């Protein structure tokens, strides 16, 4: 058997395994029983509370739409100088977002417009916002000498 034929067979086997894995994840991986569908959550480090909502409801699946993120400090004050990156995906299917959403505008009062969001199929999607702002950074240690 030639090397090219072996490589072709290996590629087909790899595709079959990948396809079966995706099929398994799609049909047999159930969302967790305690899935929290709230649109407002504290950040992992408890420095912020972040709320998200679509700019217009209802939004259509498989179309681009915008979301508004509202970022507040732990004391409830709006965070207007945040840098926000957007990530996410479909944990049940094991893939990321089909687009690359990004913050396109700071709206004031801790609100930010995120454009380029598209959910191309029904199911459980996650939007993960990574937030950083100078106001919530820990203060440097001071020399007590």
Which residue ranges define each predicted feature?
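Contiguous segments within soluble domain cores/interaction surfaces
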Residues: 2-14, 18-126, 130-145
């Amino acid at each position: 058997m030639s090397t090219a034929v072996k490589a072709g067979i290996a590629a087909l086997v790899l595709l079959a395994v990948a396809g079966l894995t995706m099929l398994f994840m799609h049909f047999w991986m159930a969302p967790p029983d305690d899935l929290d569908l709230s649109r407002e959550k504290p950040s992992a480090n408890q420095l912020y509370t972040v709320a998200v909502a679509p700019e217009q409801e209802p939004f259509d699946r498989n179309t681009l739409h915008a979301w508004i993120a509202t970022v507040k400090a732990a004391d409830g004050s709006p965070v207007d100088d945040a840098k926000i990156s957007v990530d996410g995906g479909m944990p049940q299917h094991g893939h990321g977002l089909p687009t690359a959403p990004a913050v396109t505008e700071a709206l004031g009062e801790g609100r930010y417009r995120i454009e380029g969001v598209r959910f191309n199929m029904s199911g459980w999607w996650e939007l993960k916002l990574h937030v950083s702002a100078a106001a919530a950074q820990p203060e440097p240690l001071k020399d007590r000498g």
